[in-house]
A protein has these predicted regions:
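Conserved cytosolic headpiece of P-type ATPases
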Residues: 2-231
Length: 231
């Protein structure tokens, strides 16, 4: 069985295990988990869902753009300048205009980033095909647990972080996660532990999409433990 200590150790190292080691570490096999084991793992690791962060009001998000020591210093300088020379407010006004322009730009950038992240999270699929006790099932994606064996087919989004153990000309579009414009051909070979995320061609990550081919893989991370969940 794989306990909490094992899980912490291998969270960032799934790509450097070969297929046999991955099966062994997750205490699973190509026929998949039993329903009893699925229930145990769901109790331990929870549902395969991304938590929605608490939404901050637009006003608070805008005001937070001023939360910087340099901004505090400039605001103080502007106020002092107004108090000392109220008849010459030009410098103070200029400082306030610059601060407001910077805050507005930061607020806009933050909003764009939130929209992009929301769009990325919407790419998680609602159902997926899993093999349990040698039988293929179509199940809700939130029901996946570490150790589940999942089939990936062309046009489907990847439902969790998955270590690929069989690949049939499978290419995955990872642009939403890594920025790589070309689809990545997946393989099953182990990679050095230092391999960067964008170069881990034996992994398929939640929120990416199978562009061609098909594959079989083992769920290694779910929910907030996925690369997408950690963003």
């Amino acid at each position: 069985a794989f306990g909490s200590a094992d899980r912490v150790f291998i969270m960032s190292s799934w790509h450097d295990l070969n297929s046999e080691e991955t099966f062994h570490t997750l205490d699973t096999e190509l026929d998949g988990l039993t329903e009893q084991e699925v229930q145990k793992r769901r109790s331990r690791y929870g549902m395969n869902k991304l938590k929605e962060p608490e939404k901050t009001s637009s006003i608070l998000r805008f005001l937070s753009q001023y939360h910087d020591p340099l901004n505090y210093l400039l605001i103080t300088a502007a106020i002092v300048a107004l108090l000392i020379h109220p008849e010459q407010p030009g410098d103070a006004i200029f400082i306030f205009i610059v601060l407001t322009a910077n805050a507005t730009f930061g607020f806009w950038q933050e909003g764009q980033a939130e929209q992009a992240m929301d769009a990325l999270k919407q790419m998680s699929v609602s159902t997926c095909v899993v093999i349990r006790e040698g039988i293929e099932w179509s199940i809700p994606t939130p029901d996946l647990v570490p150790g589940d064996v999942v089939k990936l087919d062309e046009g489907l989004n990847v439902p969790a972080d998955i270590r690929v153990v069989e690949s049939y000309q499978c290419k995955v579009d990872e642009s939403s996660l890594t920025g790589e414009s070309n689809s990545i051909l997946k393989s099953t070979d182990a990679l050095p532990s230092s391999t960067l995320l964008a170069d881990r061609n034996n992994m398929a990550y939640m929120g990416t999409c199978v562009s061609t081919g098909r594959a079989i893989g083992i769920v290694v991370e779910t929910g907030m433990s996925t690369e997408l969940g950690r963003i």
